[in-house]
Amino acid sequence: MEVRKAFMSDLPALLKIINAYAQQGIMLPRTEFEMAENIRDFSVVFSGETLLGCGALHFYGPSHGEVRSLAVSPESKQSGIGRAIVDALEEEARAQRLDSVFAFTYVPGFFRKLGFTEVEPGELPLKAWKD
């Protein structure tokens, strides 16, 4: 399985998977403009022309990053795609020399399995709470 950086041509597939989860109330919706503006944050996994999963690493200053918009297609759940994407985003965070990576999530158990721990809101960048 190859995790790669997203291209502008991936926008329709990204919007489809993210907004499908948003309609279920488990992810924030994204607009095409917002996605285009932040496309460099995204990593993806495809099988041929089919998007299997995506996730983004959004920077907050020089030392913090947030895993955002982590989504795996329903048919591909439990296949390791989510873990592979988070691993790639964490590798990117290390390459950028970030001190910490965090996630706001409706699925805390998944992130706990990957070694994330719950923290108090005051431990996160204030800007993250505003976004």
Question: In which residue ranges do the predicted regions lie?
Answer:
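Short active-site oxyanion
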Residues: 1-2, 95-101
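A short beta-loop-alpha structural element at the N-terminal edge
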Residues: 2-14
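Ligand-binding pocket scaffold of soluble enzyme catalytic domains
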Residues: 11-22, 59
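Active-site rim helix/loop that mediates acceptor-substrate recognition in acyltransferases
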Residues: 18-52
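Conserved beta-strand in the GNAT
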Residues: 44, 50-58, 63-71
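A short, internal acetyl-CoA/4′-phosphopantetheine-binding micro-motif in the GNAT/acyltransferase core
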Residues: 70-77, 106-107
